[in-house]
Amino acid sequence: MEGVLLFWKYRALFFLVLCSLVLCKVHLSQASPTSQQHNDAASLSKIYPRGSHWAVGHLMGKKSIEEYPYAYDEADRSSAAVFSEGDKPSDGYQQWKESLLNLLKMIEVNEYRNSKAMREASVYNKKFSGAEDNNLKEMLDYLYQMMNMKENTSS
């Protein structure tokens, strides 16, 4: 129940986050190739069977050991740490979580300020003066008399 209330309270924010995630997913996904693109790729592979020749010469023999994801120790192939200490994948999740919590706190503070200003400036909190109170009593008395007259004439 609390999750539903939280969702309803921040529905605009959740909608914004959902839309941005969908747009990011659509932007990063690959489009399916058309038949013309497929034919172009097939014809290029026939011309250059080993790939693009323009980048072959200057990259030959320049593989770096630091960039290779595996470390070799006595012919044992074990995975090396690809991420440094500060770049763990969970840190990205923690950063997103912290930023969303900060955003929610800012929205909450903003809503509190707006509601406080509305309560202070509200017409409903205004006390009636003596003249307005008398006018209200006169109006209610007149309405009561009209209702009594209507009941008397109908019977």
From Swiss-Prot:
Q: Which InterPro entries match?
A: Bombesin (IPR000874)
Predominant location: secreted
Per UniProt, which keywords does this protein have?
Amidation, Cleavage on pair of basic residues, Cytoplasmic vesicle, Secreted, Signal
Q: Which domain of life, per UniProt?
A: Eukaryota
The signal sequence is 1-31
Query: Keyword Secreted, does the record have it?
Result: yes
Query: In which family does this protein belong, per the annotation?
Result: Belongs to the bombesin/neuromedin-B/ranatensin family.
Q: Which PANTHER family match?
A: GASTRIN-RELEASING PEPTIDE (PTHR16866:SF2)
The entry's protein name is Gastrin-releasing peptide
Gene field: grp
